[in-house]
């Protein structure tokens, strides 16, 4: 793979926010490559080594089974797949259908997939035992995408993975999912910090408009989220910026060392809140609880 090194960055205290880094080739071939100062080349060997250290979490709720199967099939074989379901159990047990679909996939591919239901009472008991009641609603884990992602993160940590990625289950193109994971791996490999997050700006999720497909540059909510996050950065630095392009990125990944330091929001606020929290914690706005990480 060939992709840009960061060409433009904003500094927010100890936090570095890079502008979008473009991928020039998903497969850069076997020819010898002389590294330049602006373009990084990642070999297949390096990517496959990273896949073994990466878990990919797929939150799902009542999604079409063909879509879920397509997403799983697009994830590289050596990644650990963790599916966190919040699908309904009646009148049709959607979770059982998901389990049957994944069992068939595992039988055919001989790969590692972990499936868990967000409302499993045993999960709630685990959080009670860990003295983490914030995720509970009564005696069950709350509904919400953020809660599902946190469950997946904890499973990945339990399995000893060094990196964790998230992919939405509503992706229609399995090949795009494969691209996401390659970009996660490449982004981690070229990073110089052990506290790294990679967020994807992928502009090929079309919308149906006036009987055809329309490729919007930004989603409606993303446009607002990006604008206000950039305003927050500008108010701190004193210079206007548009560096944030992925405020609502469901497709993102991070090192486990960073994931262990973050606080998380509930439901669909989780993706933008990750950025807000890092600005607060590592931007010098508030006294940091993780001062050591600010030097790395």
Stretches with model-predicted labels:
Residues 174-256, 260:
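Conserved catalytic core of nucleotide-sugar-dependent glycosyltransferases
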Residues 146, 247, 256, 268-276:
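Conserved glycosyltransferase catalytic-site signature
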Residues 1-28, 268-296:
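C-terminal catalytic/acceptor-binding lobe
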Residues 1-74:
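N-proximal low-complexity "stem/linker" segments adjacent to membrane-targeting elements
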Residues 161-174:
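Short beta-strand-to-loop acidic/aromatic patch adjacent to the donor-nucleotide binding site
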Residues 46-49, 70-81, 100-108:
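Short, acidic, metal-binding catalytic loop of nucleotide-sugar glycosyltransferases
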Residues 92-161:
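Active-site-proximal specificity loops/subdomain of glycosyltransferases
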Residues 85-88:
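Acidic ATP/Mg2+-coordinating residue in the GHKL
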